[in-house]
């Protein structure tokens, strides 16, 4: 595989919507990715939180290959076994009652908005359809989920947008109370704002919002697209907050590398969705569900205990590094804020040069390693980061320009 040829072909035929690194990844195993030139990278991105079991986990590969060789797709006009098995496992893990499968986080959040509005219109009439989200939130790039996203930077040039959305600052309960007038049907929030800088919400604030929503019968939607499926050390981030929302959305790490999203809801909401009220041609695809089943079957108590241990080790190590002001997030969803003068994008580029793949979120470095990482993997990542910070490599290496 020729690196220059791959990049040139991509530039010629792929829509230029991504600022890519000049790395062509060719294969991966466990925590390690290898590029077309044979260079190895310790991956602390997991495909933006997707490869929860790392690259080519044996149980995942077998499950996907066996299902692909048996039945790859049917549409939802017929029953298949994998989607029902997966839905049952998700309901048992979340304490909710019904699942709708789609293909992505954006599709899951779009479905959650539809389900919330259907419940509210059926119960209170068409005047009650407002969805309240938080400033600095990110819920997707379809028009409805883009509108739900509380960041103007994503909104430029794509209007007009759907109506009946409102944004309030995270942590400002008075602002939420004011926005939640008679037209409000749902509050939608991420418990850790990923694209918003890897910032966890305050637990007292979350508890107030949950109690308020219950009192007013405003549905509470928790976007767990990035936080869910073990990322924070529990199956749902909701568990850290003792939170029981009406709707939870999942995606990213659920499929272990295959595209799948899920809208998970309680019976109160589910009973309003009837045949024809929502759909997805590929939703519940047997191969994707087989991959997700392998993820959930692997993610037992011992697995989650390791996530918590590695998260504690990583966070303690990061806090001791030079130039680190703050370590934010929850579990293995980690944000790193730096001293003034150090740019996260330059740190990311320096780490990549030294064989460590990391991400950015606003002004912060973001770490989303596969959940299978070991103590040795954490130490290796910390050593690379220490070199980048202490050696000031991050200030000397220029990031490649985005396409």
Enumerate the language-model features and the residues they cover.
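Active-site-adjacent loop/helix segments that line or gate small-molecule/cofactor pockets in enzymes
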Residues: 1-29
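Glycine-rich loop-to-alpha-helix module at the N-terminal edge of alpha/beta enzyme cores
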Residues: 40-126
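Catalytic PLP-binding core of fold-type I/II PLP enzymes
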Residues: 199-233
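Active-site PLP attachment segment
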Residues: 234, 242-272, 284-289
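Conserved PLP-dependent catalytic core of the aminotransferase class-I/II
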Residues: 300-354
């Amino acid at each position: 595989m020729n690196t220059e040829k791959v990049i040139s072909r991509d530039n010629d035929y792929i829509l230029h919507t991504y600022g890519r690194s000049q790395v062509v990844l060719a294969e991966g195993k466990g925590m390690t990715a290898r590029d077309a030139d044979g260079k190895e990278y310790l991956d602390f991105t997991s495909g933006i939180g997707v490869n929860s079991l790392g690259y080519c986990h044996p149980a995942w590969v077998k499950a996907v290959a066996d299902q692909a060789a048996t039945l790859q797709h049917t549409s939802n006009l017929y029953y298949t076994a994998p989607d029902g098995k997966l839905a049952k496992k998700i309901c048992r893990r979340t304490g909710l009652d019904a699942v709708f499968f789609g293909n992505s986080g954006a599709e899951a959040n779009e479905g959650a908005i539809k389900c919330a509005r259907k419940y509210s219109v059926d119960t209170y009439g068409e005047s009650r359809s407002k969805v309240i989200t938080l400033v600095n939130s990110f819920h997707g790039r379809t028009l409805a989920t883009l509108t739900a996203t509380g960041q103007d930077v994503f909104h430029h040039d794509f209007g007009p947008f759907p109506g009946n959305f409102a944004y309030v600052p995270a942590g400002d309960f008075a602002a939420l109370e004011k926005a939640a007038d008679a037209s409000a049907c749902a509050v939608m929030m991420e418990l850790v704002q990923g694209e918003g800088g890897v910032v966890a919400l305050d637990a007292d604030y979350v508890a107030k919002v949950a109690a308020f929503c219950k009192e007013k019968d405003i549905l509470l939607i928790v976007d767990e697209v990035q936080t869910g499926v073990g990322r924070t050390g529990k199956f749902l981030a909701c568990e850290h907050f003792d939170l029981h929302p009406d709707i939870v959305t999942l995606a990213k790490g659920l499929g272990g590398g295959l595209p799948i999203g899920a809208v998970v809801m309680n019976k109160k909401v589910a009973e309003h969705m009837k045949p024809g009220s929502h759909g997805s041609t590929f939703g519940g695809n047997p191969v994707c569900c087989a991959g997700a089943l392998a993820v959930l079957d692997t993610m037992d108590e011992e697995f989650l205990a390791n996530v918590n241990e590695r998260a504690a080790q990583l966070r303690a190590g990061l806090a001791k590094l030079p130039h680190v002001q703050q370590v934010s997030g929850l579990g293995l969803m980690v944000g790193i804020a730096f001293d003034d003068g150090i740019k996260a994008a330059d740190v990311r580029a320096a780490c990549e040069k030294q064989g460590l793949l990391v991400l950015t979120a606003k002004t912060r470095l973001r770490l989303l390693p596969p959940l299978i990482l070991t103590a040795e993997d954490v130490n290796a990542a910390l050593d690379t980061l220490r070199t980048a910070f202490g050696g000031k490599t991050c200030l000397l290496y220029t990031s490649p320009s985005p396409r």
